From Swiss-Prot:
Source taxon at top rank: Eukaryota
Identification of the protein by name: Aldo-keto reductase family 1 member C4
Subcellular location: Cytoplasm, Cytosol
Provenance organism: Macaca fascicularis (Crab-eating macaque)
Source organism phylogeny: Eukaryota, Metazoa, Chordata, Craniata, Vertebrata
PROSITE patterns hit by this protein: ALDOKETO_REDUCTASE_1 (PS00798), ALDOKETO_REDUCTASE_2 (PS00062), ALDOKETO_REDUCTASE_3 (PS00063)
EC number from the UniProt entry: 1.1.1.-, 1.1.1.209, 1.1.1.210, 1.1.1.51
Binding residue positions for NADP(+): 20-24, 50, 166-167, 190, 216-221, 270-280
Length: 323
């Protein structure tokens, strides 16, 4: 089998490609560019495509996937597509309609994976970040287990093959896992993960529960000003990472991606640059030594790019716990 298509078994019997293409782009990127780069990613060998309601690009991503199916490049079952439930739809009765709305935009019959995007409920409605007259984001309170049960119904209805969570800490995962009515465990927890924030404790916990850890922001984020402090360190310029890149004659990005794969983490590579999209698939063409891995482990400084500081007062804010 082509190494590009390596997959990991999920706890529900489905399989997820270990390398994914992240489709998020800042609003200033023209939406038609989303179609082009998603097609490019599929042509380069990506079979796992990650998007979300919040990214406001599902129409374009769906168009790209359908055009690659139509031209015979791939079949629908070759593509593993992820969407995410946004925080303004955290009412049990809103969950399935939110997924159906994504499917309508995508013009697909099902998603391979549907995730709870963040564990924090916001005031229900169509505005992604609802604010009061003082400009403060409006929170909502909700039982996450009730939302999980609504996710389970989406799986039973065949609208999502697998269901999981994103940006959950250990305590929040345990709450779902210990829910007396639990029907399906989350198959994964998608979190920020890179050499500066290697999530080793959360990774060990997830492995112990047969939950896959998926790394977003694996290259240190696109540093979009809404989400990321502009003074934060640039991961891909790290001297240790660059030295390893030189040693292996690869880019620093490839070292960061390979690091995750060798830890058993599914990794999302986000790029809108044609050359880098093609390059990122080369992650299967080399290996890091155990010494390399140790050096990369030592870069950990528990540094988080996506802090969501405007939600820090939310009762379910996930990043105050150690992990």
């Amino acid at each position: 089998m082509d190494p590009k298509y390596q997959r990991v078994a999920l706890n529900d019997g489905h399989f997820m490609p270990v390398l994914g293409f992240g489709t998020y782009a800042p609003p200033e990127v023209p939406r038609n560019r989303v179609v082009e780069v998603t097609k490019l990613a599929i042509e380069a060998g990506f079979r796992h495509i990650d998007s979300a309601y919040l990214y406001n690009n599902e129409e374009q991503v769906g168009l790209a996937i359908r055009s690659k199916i139509a031209d015979g490049s791939v079949k629908r079952e070759d593509i593993f597509y992820t969407s995410k439930l946004w925080c303004t739809f955290f009412r049990p009765q809103l969950v399935q309609p939110a997924l159906e709305s994504s499917l309508k935009k995508l013009q697909l019959d099902y998603v391979d994976l549907y995730l709870i995007h963040f564990p924090m409920a916001l005031k229900p409605g169509e505005t992604p970040l609802p604010k009061d007259e003082n400009g403060k984001v409006m929170f909502d309170t909700v039982d996450l287990c009730a939302i999980w049960e609504a996710m389970e119904k989406c799986k039973d209805a065949g609208l999502a093959k697998s269901i999981g969570v994103s940006n959950f800490n250990r305590r929040q995962l345990e709450m779902i896992l210990n829910n007396p009515g639990l029907k399906y465990k989350p198959v994964c927890n998608q979190v920020e993960c890179h050499p500066y924030l290697n999530q080793s404790k959360l990774l060990d916990f997830c492995k112990s529960k047969d939950i896959v850890l998926v790394a977003h922001s694996a290259l240190g984020t696109q540093r979009h000003k809404l989400w990321v402090d502009q003074n934060s360190p640039a991961l891909l310029e790290d001297p240790v990472l660059c030295a390893l890149a030189k040693k292996h004659k690869r880019s620093p990005a490839l070292i960061a991606l390979r690091y995750q794969l060798q830890r058993g983490v599914v990794v999302l590579a986000k790029s809108y640059n044609e050359q880098r999209i093609r390059e990122n698939v080369q992650v299967f063409e080399f290996q890091l030594t155990s010494e390399d891995m140790k050096v990369l482990d030592d870069l950990n400084r528990n540094f988080r790019y996506v802090v969501m500081d405007f939600l820090v007062d939310h009762p379910d804010y996930p990043f105050s716990d150690e992990y």
